[in-house]
């Protein structure tokens, strides 16, 4: 099968590699977003997909508008039987969608119709889900609303972060893409309409979502810290300074500790032996890793040793 692959970020790279290595699939070109200025030097940086495509010796096309007529002509000249889209970053119009004979196939990082939208991985962890997965679908003109081909469930472990889950889903999703294209070509791929009644949306997140509300439950705080790690990161304030929180563990307070009149966000314990324990809306969390603005990420015992944090201090 001759295909065009469209993708941009790290999530799309395993899929590109696995399709490239599949004997029955030929990638005629890779389409990705234009190079962007990044970092302190504001240097132009290629997308991760562009970097991998060059490594594999594949033809790369870049555009800021996939639906521009001259670009559609370029795509048509490639005669793709399918267009595979993984986190490309642009919405495909009707002319592009109708171009390949087998259609446009998308890989999405959730079990559709749950978590349509831009941030399904973050939302699954933040919401405390135990299971998520990946879905392949035939694309239509909506956002993640096309007919489902295959789904693959993936367990969310308590030690998972958005980063680790991202990598798992990207790899498993790459395998599912290979199966999907092979079965489409054989004429045995299923097709199922999405249930609008079960649909939910994972809207794009920004840095503000990482601000910790200590009045929430310990489990909610635990899930938020995991769900925004490594980006955009959970944070609070301490003595007027930004404090990033990289990992916490929920704790059950004893009856005696619960009898103390403590506010949410108050430091219950700050010692090298016990680390840093903070009151939450229902119990407490133990901070494992944290980072003061402009400093390195360190463990709680080292933070206690290096900074004057003490019982009764208020976070947030």
UniProtKB/Swiss-Prot annotation:
One of its GO terms (molecular function) is methionyl-tRNA formyltransferase activity. It catalyses: L-methionyl-tRNA(fMet) + (6R)-10-formyltetrahydrofolate = N-formyl-L-methionyl-tRNA(fMet) + (6S)-5,6,7,8-tetrahydrofolate + H(+). (6S)-5,6,7,8-tetrahydrofolate binds at residues 110-113. InterPro entries: Fmt, Formyl_trans_C, Formyl_transf_N, Formyl_transf_N_sf, Formyl_transferase-like_C_sf, Met-tRNA-FMT_C, Met-tRNA-FMT_N. It comes from the Bacteria. Keywords: Protein biosynthesis, Transferase. GO terms for cellular component: cytosol. Its EC number is 2.1.2.9. SUPFAM superfamilies: FMT C-terminal domain-like (SSF50486), Formyltransferase (SSF53328). Gene3D superfamilies: 3.40.50.12230. It is an enzyme of class 2 (transferase). Attaches a formyl group to the free amino group of methionyl-tRNA(fMet). The formyl group appears to play a dual role in the initiator identity of N-formylmethionyl-tRNA by promoting its recognition by IF2 and preventing the misappropriation of this tRNA by the elongation apparatus. Belongs to the Fmt family. This is Methionyl-tRNA formyltransferase. It comes from Halothermothrix orenii (strain H 168 / OCM 544 / DSM 9562). The gene is fmt.
